[in-house]
From Swiss-Prot:
It comes from Rickettsia akari (strain Hartford). Residues 83-124 are annotated as: Domain II. Residues 344-463 are annotated as: Domain IV, binds dsDNA. Its main location: cytoplasm. NCBIfam families: DnaA (TIGR00362). InterPro entries: AAA+_ATPase, Chromosome_initiator_DnaA, Chromosome_initiator_DnaA-like, Chromosome_initiator_DnaA_CS, DnaA_C, DnaA_dom, DnaA_N_dom, DnaA_N_sf. It is found in: Cytoplasm. Pfam families: Bac_DnaA, Bac_DnaA_C, DnaA_N. Oligomerizes as a right-handed, spiral filament on DNA at oriC. This is Chromosomal replication initiator protein DnaA.
Length: 463
């Protein structure tokens, strides 16, 4: 970030230029994922009495930025111009923009008794583990979390995020958020009628209704709810009759100001074998990408899970899991459960070595192959020592400590035995490697700076 003050007048063009500097700083600080979620569609409007006025695309985005980022944005503005005392964020139509209003045909539906709706109890299909309280929020999923929370808290009014379309890879938290919406509504607005089900089950119930000549009951059931949540909508791709029924259900609910939440493994525009009119409607509201997890988010998820389970796991094991199980949250939690279960059944202590052995097969499928040589090169470069120092016997601290760190990382990031690692470090025996690992583990207990340094090296080596 430029450390020089930019002296500005009240001319709009200058403030637009200033906002571009602030936006770039936000991008640099928070990264592409979070920037695209919140700031990319924010525009400068005007300045008045030392106040900069920005425009957000929706009330939802405006409120989230105000609550989470307003002070950071103000400080960035003041960095460039210290006469700015405050910022305000509004929502309004920008000059020169137009909105297309699509009129949906008005439909009516019969009011059916609660016993009919309750024949399928939503809460029997919700997982008690999946609530907002135990959803770990990070940059990759912040937009999706905030949108899901807004839908749940809408208290009967339809949110701006209608439909809310959540998409991303398997095991990243989409289903968790949908269940969390259901539980929140049950606890805070129990009179609201909610249906949650997979697209596959939606199709099977529709086919059953056709076979039993109960299509009218099917339509009434799904079109008389306050919130309809359909998981894995990609399942109806290529299924024309189900798509047709979903299309009319969607239209009826949206036309009657009912909330829809939909999940998918890809964005609406990337769906194949689905009608264009459905693609278009899926993108009407808020489309939120649940991105792949970062190391920090995986670490937070593990720590939260460990706290819930009230177990003790060594720090090096937690760091190892967060570094190695990168595919999705489901596999990450599964790996943790497997390690804990193995310890409970065998009465063996949870150690890094045991963890590596227990998860050997899973690690192979997740792991980019990292060699001891890769680690030696990265560590030598990081600490500005010669690569040959890794296999030397020099005892100078500036050489010995990086060598110990490289041995520690070799054990953490490869499946090599201590003896094999020792051979790569100038034919040292396994006791020397063991001493180095224990030394680093002891230092990690209290040395926060070293812990951050090793975490950084792990991330560099993983990607």
């Amino acid at each position: 970030m430029n450390t020089n003050q930019i002296i500005l007048t009240d001319q709009g063009d200058n403030y637009v230029n200033l906002w571009s500097h602030v936006a770039q700083d936000l991008y640099n600080h928070y990264g592409e994922t979070l920037y695209n979620s919140w700031f990319s569609k924010v525009n400068f409007i005007e300045s008045s009495l030392n106040t900069v006025i920005l425009c957000a695309p929706t009330n939802f985005v405006r409120d989230w930025i105000k609550s989470k980022y307003s002070m950071v944005i103000l400080q960035l503005f003041q960095h460039y111009n210290n006469t700015i005392k405050s910022i305000d964020i509004i929502t309004k139509e920008l000059p020169g923009t137009t909105q297309t209003v699509i009129e949906l045909p008005t439909k009516t539906f019969a009011d059916i008794g609660s016993s009919e709706l309750n024949s399928e109890n939503i809460f029997s299909t919700l997982d008690v583990r999946f609530t907002f309280d135990n959803f770990v929020v990070g940059a990759p999923n912040e937009l999706a979390y905030a949108a899901a929370r807004a839908v749940a808290e809408s208290s009967g009014a339809v949110s701006e995020s209608n439909p809310l379309f959540l998409y991303g890879g398997v095991g990243l938290g989409k289903t968790h958020l949908m269940h969390a919406i259901g539980w929140y509504i049950k606890q805070n607005n129990p009179s609201r009628k909610v249906i949650y089900m997979s697209a596959e089950k939606f199709m099977y119930q529709f086919v059953k209704a056709l076979r039993n000549k109960e299509v009218i009951l099917f339509k009434e059931k799904f079109r008389s709810v306050d919130v309809l949540m359909i998981d894995d909508i990609q399942f109806i791709c290529g299924k024309d009759s189900t798509q047709e029924e979903f299309f009319h259900t969607f239209n009826t609910l949206i036309d009657n100001n009912r909330q829809m939440v939909i999940s998918c493994d890809r964005s609406p525009s990337d769906l194949d074998n689905i009608e264009d009119r459905i693609k278009s409607r899926l993108g009407w509201g808020l489309v939120a990408d649940v991105h792949s997890t970062t190391y920090e988010l995986r670490l937070g998820i593990l720590e939260s899970k460990i706290e819930q389970m009230n177990v003790k796991i060594p720090k090096d094991v937690i760091d190892f899991l967060a570094s190695k199980i990168v595919s999705n949250v489901r596999e990450l939690e599964g790996a943790l459960n497997k390690v804990i279960a193995h310890s409970n059944f065998t009465l063996k202590e949870i150690t890094l070595e045991n963890t590596q052995n227990i998860l050997r097969d899973l690690l192979r499928s997740n792991e980019r192959i990292i060699t001891v040589e890769d680690i030696q090169k990265k560590v030598a470069s990081r600490y500005n020592i010669k690569l040959s120092d890794m296999s030397s016997s020099r005892r100078l601290r500036e050489v010995a400590r990086p060598r110990q760190i490289a041995m520690y990382l070799s054990k953490a990031l490869t499946l090599k035995s201590l003896a094999d690692i020792g051979k790569k470090f100038g034919k040292k025996d396994h006791t020397t490697v063991m001493y180095a690992i224990k030394k680093v583990e002891e230092l990690l207990e209290n040395d926060i700076e070293l812990r951050e340094e090793i975490n950084l090296l792990m991330k560099i080596l993983q990607h």
